From Swiss-Prot:
<keyword id="KW-0547">Nucleotide-binding</keyword>
<dbReference type="Pfam" id="PF05746">
    <property type="entry name" value="DALR_1"/>
</dbReference>
<dbReference type="InterPro" id="IPR008909">
    <property type="entry name" value="DALR_anticod-bd"/>
</dbReference>
<dbReference type="InterPro" id="IPR009080">
    <property type="entry name" value="tRNAsynth_Ia_anticodon-bd"/>
</dbReference>
<keyword id="KW-0963">Cytoplasm</keyword>
<dbReference type="InterPro" id="IPR014729">
    <property type="entry name" value="Rossmann-like_a/b/a_fold"/>
</dbReference>
<dbReference type="GO" id="GO:0006420">
    <property type="term" value="P:arginyl-tRNA aminoacylation"/>
</dbReference>
<dbReference type="GO" id="GO:0005524">
    <property type="term" value="F:ATP binding"/>
</dbReference>
<dbReference type="GO" id="GO:0005737">
    <property type="term" value="C:cytoplasm"/>
</dbReference>
<dbReference type="InterPro" id="IPR001412">
    <property type="entry name" value="aa-tRNA-synth_I_CS"/>
</dbReference>
<dbReference type="InterPro" id="IPR036695">
    <property type="entry name" value="Arg-tRNA-synth_N_sf"/>
</dbReference>
<dbReference type="Pfam" id="PF03485">
    <property type="entry name" value="Arg_tRNA_synt_N"/>
</dbReference>
<dbReference type="GO" id="GO:0004814">
    <property type="term" value="F:arginine-tRNA ligase activity"/>
</dbReference>
<keyword id="KW-0648">Protein biosynthesis</keyword>
<protein>
    <recommendedName>
        <fullName>Arginine--tRNA ligase</fullName>
        <ecNumber>6.1.1.19</ecNumber>
    </recommendedName>
</protein>
<dbReference type="InterPro" id="IPR001278">
    <property type="entry name" value="Arg-tRNA-ligase"/>
</dbReference>
<comment type="similarity">
    <text>Belongs to the class-I aminoacyl-tRNA synthetase family.</text>
</comment>
Length: 577
């Protein structure tokens, strides 16, 4: 259940009854401090100003119309006109029971939408590197959350599978008489790529052949298409291994590469010209956008077709947005692409809107993210200054986690140890990223991410096992426990219950904003509240069976919420650590 939404509507109705306009914003927020209650309505200031009255006076009038009977035990006005709302323990107890009775922990499903999520997007014939990590795991957390909320999610892996480099690669493979590319490892392909590029730059005859091969590939010649398909196939087979290791839900079926949009490009250029949006400028087709100015303060020109007839990324992105609306019937499109691409996307979307390809009612959202930095504050690199391969990073995570868990569990069987090390190591890498606000750069630090203290995956995984251990000791009868009532008398019980019931609100924010760090912060806070509750409210040695069972149910909902929350992040939980 979404308590924030329930209270917002109640306060809004009371504000309207007190004379506020129908579109007033109650601004109900979770309270930052316990003394301010569970929720606080902060909307009186802005509305009172419009009405020409003191905020506190408006708050007093709102209170006369505010009916929170059965929801709040106390409502008070604080400061200049904040309304503090303290939830009723009986209300909390009832909704904890309801959450436990539901597989979804009482989380409602909003109106179903078709949402396209563009994420990961590696390049063909290159191995995935750390630069692909953020898009891949942040995008996947958004996908998992949206799917849990009941939306139809279309994963779009916008793979770089087209361009002049393919003529170069095919020419080099042919020269090396290695047309049987299917048996090659991607590491070989990377070497081939470097060698091919060297020849392309230094050997004009080879470069000319490569350019001819691009033309043949683009014209649909079957031999060259087959070679191209091999290159794509090898790459995506290798990438799938990485996705599976990362516990990411992408599959081969989600690949929607740049090549998909090629047939659309001539028609788009012709249509933009026919609509008067694109004009000829120095032999190229250009759209001038008033929204973007060049250094001289003139409308910026965005090239959609070069003088030689070639198309640009912008043209592909226009076609891509059009396809996602017209063919995939998207109600909303999310792009997990780094912040450096922001202006490029804004320009493409400005053209998309002007051309009427995607209506304003369908949001195109750039969920941009910052960079992953080393401890020196510079982009994360190998010691030699090279790009860190994602597979190498995951190997190191596994090795470090293996040492860590072996130290803590010297007698654990090898197969169990390996499984635990994988959950901890991969979880640590993912959680370290997901727990940071995606819009900022973050420092990659092995020691911090593998620590058992603080907002880390090992701490969260351990917190979950700690709650489970209570049940192992309790030797509970599931049926008896299900029938037992929840009774909330202690402050720490109430605080834990209220936080547990804010799970849906947290999911809603992640779904709306694409910010998994909000879920990480919620789960970390929840684990801390459980720790305080466990310390001050004895469970197994409670004063009565009634209190014991009630507290066990709070522990049970905590375990379920931690597991489900971590699952929406793609973080594996374990039963023992």
């Amino acid at each position: 259940m979404n308590i924030q939404a329930l209270l917002s509507e109640k306060v809004r109705q009371a504000m309207i009854a007190a004379g506020a306009p129908a579109d007033c914003e109650p601004q109900v927020r979770q309270s930052a401090k316990v003394q301010f209650g569970d929720y606080q309505a902060n909307g009186m200031m802005a509305v009172a100003k419009k009405l020409g009255m003191a905020p506190r006076q408006l708050a007093e009038q709102v209170l006369t119309h505010l009916d929170l009977n059965g929801i709040a035990s106390k409502v008070e006005i604080a400061g200049p006109g904040f309304i503090n709302i303290f939830l009723d323990p009986a209300f909390l107890a009832e909704h904890v029971q309801q959450a436990l009775a539901s597989d979804r922990l009482g989380v409602a499903t909003p109106e179903k939408q078709t949402i396209v999520v563009d994420y990961s997007a590696p390049n063909v014939a290159k191995e995935m590197h750390v630069g692909h990590l953020r898009s891949t795991i942040i995008g996947d957390a958004a996908v998992r959350t949206l799917e849990f909320l009941g939306h139809k999610v279309i994963r779009a892996n916008h793979v770089g599978d087209w361009g002049t480099q393919f003529g170069m690669l095919i020419a080099w493979l042919e020269k090396q008489q290695q047309e049987n590319a299917g048996e090659m490892e991607l590491a070989d392909l990377e070497g081939f790529y470097r060698d091919a590029k060297k020849h392309y730059d230094e050997d004009e005859e080879f470069a000319e052949r490569a350019r001819n091969y691009v033309v043949k590939l683009q014209s649909g010649d079957e031999y060259f298409r087959e070679m191209w398909r091999k290159l794509v196939d090898i790459t995506m087979t290798q990438n799938q291994i990485t996705y599976d290791r990362l516990n990411v839900t992408l599959t081969r079926d989600d690949v929607m590469g740049e090549s998909l949009y090629n047939p659309m490009l001539p028609g788009i250029v012709a249509d933009l010209k026919a609509k008067g949006l694109a004009v000829e400028s120095e032999g190229a087709s250009v759209v001038f956008l008033d929204e973007f100015k060049n250094k001289e303060g003139e409308p910026m020109g965005v090239i959609i077709q070069k003088k030689d007839g070639g198309y640009l990324y912008t043209t592909t992105d226009i076609a891509c947005a059009k396809y996602r609306y017209e063919t995939l019937h998207a109600d909303r499109v999310l792009y997990y692409i780094d912040s450096r691409q922001h202006q490029h996307l804004m320009q493409a979307w400005a053209i998309v809107r002007k051309a009427g390809y995607v209506p304003e009612s369908v949001p195109l959202e750039h969920h941009m993210f910052g960079m992953m930095l080393g401890k020196d504050g510079k982009p994360f690199k190998t010691r030699a200054g090279g790009t860190v391969k994602l597979a190498d990073l995951l190997d190191e995570a596994l090795e470090r986690a293996r040492r860590l868990v072996a130290e803590k569990n010297p007698d654990m069987p090898a197969d169990e140890l390996e499984k635990l090390a994988n959950a901890v190591g991969i979880g640590a890498v993912k959680y370290a990223d997901l727990s940071k606000n995606r819009t900022t750069d973050y420092i990659f630090d092995w020691d911090n991410m593998l620590a058992f203290e603080g907002n880390t995956a090992p701490y969260m995984q351990y917190a979950y096992t700690r709650v489970l251990s209570v049940f192992r000791k309790a030797e509970i009868n599931e049926e008896q426990l299900a029938a037992a009532p929840v009774i909330i008398r202690e402050d720490r019980e109430a605080q834990l219950a209220a936080r547990l019931l804010q799970f849906e609100e947290t999911l809603t924010v992640v779904a709306r904003e694409g910010t998994p760090h909000v879920m990480c912060a919620y789960l970390y806070d929840l684990a801390g509240l459980f720790s305080g509750f466990y310390e001050h409210c004895p469970i197994l040695s409670a004063e009565s069976e009634e209190v014991r069972n009630s507290r066990l149910k709070l522990a049970q909902l905590t375990a379920k919420t931690l597991k489900l929350g971590l699952d929406t992040l793609g973080i594996e939980t374990v039963e023992r650590m």
